[in-house]
Amino acid sequence: MSRKYFGTDGVRGRVGTFPITPDFAMKLGWAAGKVLASTGTQEVLIGKDTRSSGYMLESAIEAGLSAAGVNVALIGPMPTPAVAYLASTFRADAGVVISASHNPFYDNGIKFFSNSGTKLNDQQELEIEALLDQALNHNAMECVSSELLGKVRRITDAAGRYIEFCKGVFAKDLTLAGLKIVVDSANGAAYHIAPNVYRELGAEVISINDKPNGTNINDHCGATHLDSLQTAVMVHEADLGIAMDGDADRVMFVDHNGHVVDGDQILYILAKSAKQQGTMTGGVVGTLMSNLGLEIALKEMDIPFKRAKVGDRYVVEQLKQTGWRIGGEGSGHILHLDHASTGDAVVASLLVLQAVLQSGQSLAEIVSCMKKLPQVLLNVRLTANNADEILASAAVKQAVIEAEAVLAENGRVLLRKSGTEPLIRVMVESTDPEMSQAQAEHIAKVVTSF
């Protein structure tokens, strides 16, 4: 049975528009509380990012959980990975994150997970949706008796505990003293976390986009808009810059020359360091969109590489299947399962800084050995909803075969349908940009002929 409200990243949408309304949030909290209580859950921990709508949704979910007889612990604005960690630390039975990650302020979302940081299983989500439908359509939300109502407490030392956890990831024989770092917190959940972590480890920190006002989260800043970070690194003559997104589950770097170091390059740095330190377990998991340059660079170090479907959840699945520890996406979702159960921007950044210090090189130098291949990406708009038919056609398959023959071992071809628009995305990457462009245009022409 397919899920009605829960997507791959919980429930998400435009604030004030169903399902991101206070009524829906309260009834979702109640339904989740009923299902979780049936498995022995006594307390749920709630964290959020810095969107103004977070207060409204937090209060609504809190009311629903309390009505179901579940206690609530509030930790305020906190990175998504911090909520996963703190749910376990504070002995809560489950966690809730109120965030829409890198989306604009007018969006928000609600995500539930266990105290081990994993999302609820499909059966639990279906049970929650069944109760939620009753509450929405038949006003069937029943409140427990007064003496059984859930109690609510606010935890004031959550940030300090998470900061100490992050610092514990960093090698105890190293210090960031002597490094000048620019940190862009995207006016998001890490604004009071990330700068303090680096400062307490000895770095000189220039903090930008660290004054959230409820509407400026991800607004031309953070991991998805690196211009201001690049400028700040150059102006302050910093050693490097670090940018996170609104809920701090993805990270990007800028080197001292102002050049972007993306998720694929971060994976290379972590894998190279693990290989040199003798801590490498298996290989690295990327995605279908990971740059071929990463695969080539890892192969040169005899490090295996696998591609998962696009999406950090699929990277996690592949890591668990293989028993490998390092994986991620070019967008900056970086996983190192030896240190965190989910993508954690602060933890990943510390592992990169540790690798840089251990190498004795600058960030620019350590990443220079990985040569990213130029990618050509063409979006072919369809006149009908027939992407699957086109991708399965003999003509398109033949065009791909011909392109791969031309590229040989120097490139690759990837065709994907968009999950949100009537598009087929044609991606070609190779050592020869002109060849990539020509092959991408040829395949796009074949796709357009349908």
UniProtKB/Swiss-Prot annotation:
Record-linked Gene3D superfamilies: Alpha-D-Glucose-1,6-Bisphosphate, subunit A, domain 3 (3.40.120.10), Alpha-D-phosphohexomutase, C-terminal domain (3.30.310.50)
Broadest EC class assigned to this enzyme: isomerase
Keywords for the protein's UniProt record, in alphabetical order: Isomerase, Magnesium, Metal-binding, Phosphoprotein
A Pfam family assignment: PGM_PMM_III
Cofactor annotation remark: Binds 1 Mg(2+) ion per subunit.
GO CC annotations on file: cytosol
GO biological process: one example: carbohydrate metabolic process
Gene: glmM2
Binding site for Mg(2+): S101, D245, D247, D249
Catalytic reaction(s) noted: alpha-D-glucosamine 1-phosphate = D-glucosamine 6-phosphate
NCBIfam families per record: glmM, PRK10887.1
Protein name: Phosphoglucosamine mutase 2
Sequence similarity: Belongs to the phosphohexose mutase family.
Chain positions found as Phosphoserine: S101
InterPro entries for the chain: A-D-PHexomutase_a/b/a-I, A-D-PHexomutase_a/b/a-I/II/III, A-D-PHexomutase_a/b/a-II, A-D-PHexomutase_a/b/a-III, A-D-PHexomutase_C, A-D-PHexomutase_C_sf, A-D-PHexomutase_CS, Alpha-D-phosphohexomutase_SF
Obligatory cofactor(s): Mg(2+)
Entries under PANTHER family matching the protein: PHOSPHOGLUCOMUTASE (ALPHA-D-GLUCOSE-1,6-BISPHOSPHATE-DEPENDENT), PHOSPHOHEXOSE MUTASE
